[in-house]
Amino acid sequence: KYKGQHCCHNDFMLNKILKQDWGFDGAVVSDWSGTHSTDEAATNGLDVEMGTWTDGLKLLGRPFTYNDYFLANPYLKGLKEGRYAVKDLDDKVRRMLRLCFRTNMDRHRPYGSFATPEHADVARKIGEEGIVLLKNDKGFFPIAPGRYSKILVVGENAVRSLTVGGGSSELKVKREISPLQGLKEKYGDDRISYTMGYTSDPSKYNVDSLKQQAIAMAKDAEVVLFIGGLNKDAHQDCEGEDRQIFELPYEQGALISQLAASNKNTGVIIISGNGVSMPWLKSVPALMQSWYLGSEAGYATANVVSGEVNPSGKMPFSIPVKLEDNAAHHFGTKAFPGDGTDVVYEEGILVGYRWHDTKKIPALFPFGYGMSYTTFSYGKMATNKKVYGKEDTIELSFTLANDGKCAGAEAAQIYVSQSNPLLERPVKELKAFKKVFLDAGERKVVSLSIPVKELAYYDDKKQDWVVDSDQFTLHCGASSTDIKSSVSI
């Protein structure tokens, strides 16, 4: 709920903001079991009720048919009795028809295709560009084919299916390439050994035996790749249940430390949808942040690990050093997890890097951070003028050079700060970015545009977007904390 009304039929959020202020002309669809009232669903902006009294798979509680939906017979009865306006019904129908015609009811829409080689290529490329290199001491990565003859892969996530589970994020793929399969195809079966090391289901395995076997095998390997992280089980990267710990589950942290003690040439690949604590970080020379990369995960992983693809991903969020550095945990239990009924949103607009910047709390890995197998240098940023009107567009440019020996891509970022805001504002905010591909030794002039109206913030008292007449500073950087040059306008 938000301010006492369920979000699926919240008058302020749906009618006032979404449909009136933003001019949204599409259809609002409820979450499964998100509808709770015919009165509110009829008048507060909900257009399509879905999955009432189900979790998407089975009925919850009493028997319930489609006719029992809040927007079915109860709504029809209210319309006939004059309790609900027909104009609201007409609006719902228009929105649903508009959605249909925009999608599958277009007679001229070409036939689609499923699971083609082209789809696989796109999935692999997205995965490759998303992987983030976070640490790479002494050139641990890339591991070129032929560099080692005895490579040990440890970790359940190297073989576990990560397209299924998690609720609504589940994929139904034609095939799924695991990281282990991708690595074996890249380096050859004879060079890759595998052991689980830990398990998410201790009832089926002797946990200590798994750990001891991994430690013993690590001593005999030339290089160790630990592939772990989270999965889509309950209380991890799954809808409906919050995580209960910030640490890696299944004692993975202790296992990483023990593997590193047995073999100093141990690199870590974390597969997860969000951050984890890393007390073991100093004990390993290299770390990659991977994600749930879909059907081609194994090929994407192997291509980046081997150097066939140069990593170019940047962190889409900040990873705090400890849980208490996160804004939601700074204000105590009233902010999270709340009192069982209410959660007080104390941090306001200071979320993620805005919190770390404004409160001067260093992140372990900041928003926008990501390494490469090459190095980039930034020239000084310049703007086309110094004074702008509210309808103008800021044109900025800088030179970006690849100073290394291999091709790569850099996602350059532009942040903006305001000198004297009238309301609380973060130290700076991301306003533009561009990923630039450069060959070894190549340099390019990078140009970006920022409409002045993008500098606006929302004044809740005026209920409008406001651009103050003030001095703003543009910052060009490789991450939210790695600023290369700044220009005031």
Please tell me what each predicted stretch does.
Residues 89, 106-110, 281:
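Conserved alpha/beta enzyme-core scaffolds, especially Rossmann-like or related mixed alpha/beta domains
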Residues 104-107, 420:
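Active-site-adjacent bridging/hinge elements
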Residues 54-64, 87-92, 224, 294-300, ...:
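Short, basic, helix/turn surface patches
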Residues 45, 62-105:
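Long, well-ordered, tryptophan-enriched scaffold segments
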Residues 24-61:
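Short acidic/histidine-rich active-site segments
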